[in-house]
C-alpha cells in the first residue's frame, strides 16, 4: 500500500533502526518505546490487521511468532518479554498494518489489573 507508513519503512523509504529483515518480514525499533527494549515485527505484505488475516497468511503469521523470541533474545531479552498485537481501533491499533510489538527489559507491569 503506497501511503502506509509501515510499508514505506519496510521498503526503505522512511529510515528506521532496523532489527531484522528478510524477503517476508521486517523488524525495527519503536520510535516511542514503552520499555527499554521495544521493537516491532511486520510482514512486508500489507495486511491491515489481524482481523484481515486469513488462512492464506498462516505460514507468515507462524514465521512471525517463531521469529519474535529469536529477535528478543538477540536484543538482550533473555529473561522474558511481552508480545502485543493491537487489533482494530477498539483494540488500540494506531497503524493499520499488522505488527507485533516485542517489549521487555526492566520491570514490565501486568497487562490488566486484577481486582
Which ranges hold each PLM region?
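HIT superfamily nucleotide-processing domains
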Residues: 1-115
Amino acid at each position: 500500500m503506497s501511503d502506509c507508513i509501515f510499508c514505506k519503512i519496510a521498503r526503505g523509504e522512511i529510515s528506521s533502526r532496523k532489527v531484522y529483515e528478510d524477503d517476508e518480514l521486517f523488524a525495527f525499533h519503536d520510535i516511542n518505546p514503552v520499555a527499554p527494549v521495544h521493537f516491532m515485527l511486520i510482514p512486508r505484505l500489507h495486511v491491515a490487521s489481524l482481523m484481515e488475516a486469513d488462512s492464506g497468511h498462516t505460514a507468515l503469521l507462524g514465521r512471525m511468532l517463531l521469529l519474535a523470541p529469536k529477535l528478543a533474545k538477540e536484543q538482550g531479552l533473555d529473561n522474558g518479554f511481552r508480545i502485543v498485537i493491537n487489533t482494530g481501533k477498539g483494540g488500540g491499533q494506531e497503524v493499520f498494518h499488522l505488527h507485533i510489538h516485542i517489549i521487555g527489559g526492566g520491570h514490565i507491569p501486568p497487562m490488566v489489573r486484577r481486582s
